[in-house]
A protein has these predicted regions:
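Long beta-strand-rich cores associated with HINT superfamily self-processing modules
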Residues: 152-165
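Predominantly extracellular beta-rich ligand-binding scaffolds that present long acidic/polar faces
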Residues: 139
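Intein-associated homing endonuclease modules of the LAGLIDADG/DOD-type, together
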Residues: 1-133, 165-198
Length: 198
């Protein structure tokens, strides 16, 4: 999804890769899956089996903005979601000692990667990546969204914010109605300015 593209009705995923790390990862993944990979210079093509073509045919949304097919995040088993997450990080992410990041010009895909993290028991925050504001060769003029993957402090806490140590409950004067939301799986997930709360 990160580096690949496909045309409508095509049975081939096409890549243009230069980095040895990405090339090695693509080769290893195709070998593990038993999928055919061909190469011509920097151009690679993967023959996608018929049962996977619907999945890969849905990665380009409006205006060529990459997205995950909507049903993907709710139908894939956890091992497949883990593979998807690893693939996204290999394509457009970076793994650092302080945490993983994923960069994309697709705001929709950034939100979907954040949702993917939730399904994997992780958390993620989205921000506009300052490091790409002065860029010469990548992403064109689209804004870049950076998804910061959070692997620590995943235990839910009430009223947790910077400077809240020791203050978890208080009484607030209020006049007006209070509404309760109920959802089928008892998890309400809300995002405000790229920050998730559930």
């Amino acid at each position: 999804i990160g580096d690949g593209h496909t045309g409508p009705g095509s049975s081939r995923l096409r890549f243009r890769l230069r980095r040895e790390r990405k090339i090695n990862w693509l080769r290893a993944t195709c070998r593990d899956l038993g999928w055919r990979l061909t190469q011509s210079g920097e151009r690679f093509a993967v023959s996608v089996p018929a049962e996977w073509q619907e999945l890969f045919g849905g990665i380009d949304g409006r205006g060529g903005e990459k997205t995950l097919p909507k049903k993907l995040l709710v139908t894939l088993p956890r091992p497949a979601l883990e593979g998807l997450f690893d693939g996204l990080l290999e394509a457009d992410g970076c793994r650092m000692r302080t945490g993983d990041c994923y960069d994309t010009t697709s705001e929709v895909l950034a939100g979907q990667v954040q949702q993917l993290c939730l399904h994997l028991g992780l958390a993620a925050n989205i921000s506009q990546a300052d490091c790409y504001k002065e860029r010469d060769t990548s992403f064109g003029d689209k804004p870049v969204y950076r998804v910061h993957v959070v692997r620590r402090n995943l235990k839910p806490e009430v009223n947790k914010w910077s400077g809240s140590t020791g203050k978890t409950r208080w009484i607030e004067g209020w006049e007006g109605e209070v509404f309760c939301a109920e959802v089928p799986n008892n998890t309400l997930y809300v995002r405000r300015k790229g920050k998730p709360v559930w």
